[in-house]
């Protein structure tokens, strides 16, 4: 009889052979039980070959948003320290200005604040402490006239939520996460800013070529209006020659440029972990959570953006959203999140199923692969695996 992991492992091995990813680590669980797990391929291709194992630590990228930041915000709301419906300006005085004064915490958490999806904050702020003010200077995206803000997935929303947590507690986000999440759950391989564990960590991109291209495109669009004017400008030379750009393989530090600028600790990215420990954290959003009150769980499982093209709860996207990475095998009520480095978590709250896929698909360079289709296929095989267990 074949091992229950075989169909998923065979699929991922085929993607590794095709060059879609260097390696992967995954876990399929139900009711807190691990049904299937495996590690395949390489965690590091450059500067040497290091195999992926079940203990390999991955850069989770945007999975930081739900697993740390959103969880902490709701925990502090349960204690009365934060009000999810309060304006952001109550906690960050930088936002006590006309066009952003009405933005609320819940709008940040559901990506309905109107903030743009990304900005190279390391080019606009001098220090970590300057980041909220730099975001406050950012123009909001155009919104429909009917009054309800459209969903625009934005790193900036969760960068700000990280600063909200730090302002109200007086502690840095990584220390909050350690005390409030990692220690209570007994997590030993989950952290921000990994210590000297280099050979146990999956590498990511060789330099920041992808982000440099995005920064140039962002500056073109915002500052100049046409490519020719920007190409001849001193600002372009300043962007391209920035000493802050990393040139070598990013290994043992966060891939995201904004999070790296903030010392590896940010509300939108910076978390490192394994599939087993990510599974442990993901279960905190399901019935039986050790960290959240039962009455808070609906905030993570219900659609809080009705009428919008994207259905979102706090932090998570719902599978009812057309063309998301859930795929047709998951029910519309499933919730999930992706990370740019090649990570994802999808959950079926009614069956208490959790599917974790961790890859470093950006290593050694960001390629033109269909990561959405890989995630959808993984989810389908995970459903098949757990249903036949």
Predicted features by range, described:
Residues 22-24, 341-344:
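Short loop/turn microsegments at loop-to-beta-strand junctions
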């Amino acid at each position: 009889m074949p091992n229950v992991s075989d169909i998923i492992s065979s699929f991922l091995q085929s993607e590794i052979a095709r060059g879609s990813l260097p390696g992967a680590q995954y876990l399929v669980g139900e009711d807190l039980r691990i049904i299937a797990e495996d590690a395949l391929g390489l965690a590091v291709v450059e500067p040497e070959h290091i195999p992926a194992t079940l203990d390999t630590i991955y850069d989770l990228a945007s999975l930081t948003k739900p697993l740390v930041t959103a969880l902490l915000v709701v925990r502090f709301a349960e204690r009365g320290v934060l009000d999810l419906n309060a304006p952001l300006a109550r906690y960050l005085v930088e936002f006590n200005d006309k066009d952003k004064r009405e933005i609320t915490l819940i709008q940040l958490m559901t990506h309905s604040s109107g903030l743009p999806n990304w900005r190279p904050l390391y080019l606009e702020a001098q220090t970590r402490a300057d980041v909220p003010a730099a975001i406050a200077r950012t123009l909001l995206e155009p919104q429909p006239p009917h009054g309800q803000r459209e969903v625009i997935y934005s790193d900036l929303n969760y960068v700000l939520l990280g600063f909200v947590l730090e302002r109200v507690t007086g502690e840095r986000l990584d220390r909050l996460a350690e005390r409030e999440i990692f220690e209570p759950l007994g997590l030993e391989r989950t952290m921000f800013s990994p210590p000297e564990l280099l050979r146990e960590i999956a590498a990511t991109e060789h330099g920041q070529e992808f982000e440099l291209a995005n920064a140039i495109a962002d500056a073109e669009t915002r500052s100049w209006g046409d490519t020719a004017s920007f190409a001849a400008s001193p600002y372009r030379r300043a962007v391209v020659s920035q000493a802050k750009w990393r040139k070598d393989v990013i290994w043992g530090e966060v891939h995201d440029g904004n999070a790296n600028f903030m010392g590896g600790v940010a509300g939108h990215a910076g978390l490192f972990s394994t599939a087993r420990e990510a599974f442990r954290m993901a279960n905190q959003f399901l019935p039986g959570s050790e960290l959240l009150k039962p009455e808070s769980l609906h905030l993570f499982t219900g659609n809080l953006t009705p009428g919008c093209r994207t259905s979102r709860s706090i932090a998570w996207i719902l599978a009812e959203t057309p063309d998301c990475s859930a795929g047709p095998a998951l029910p519309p009520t499933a919730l999930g999140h992706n990370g740019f480095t090649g990570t994802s978590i999808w959950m079926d709250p009614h069956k208490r199923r959790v599917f974790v896929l961790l890859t470093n698909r950006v290593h050694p360079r960001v390629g033109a692969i269909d990561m959405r289709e890989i995630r959808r296929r993984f989810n389908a095989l995970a459903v098949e695996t757990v249903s036949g267990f």
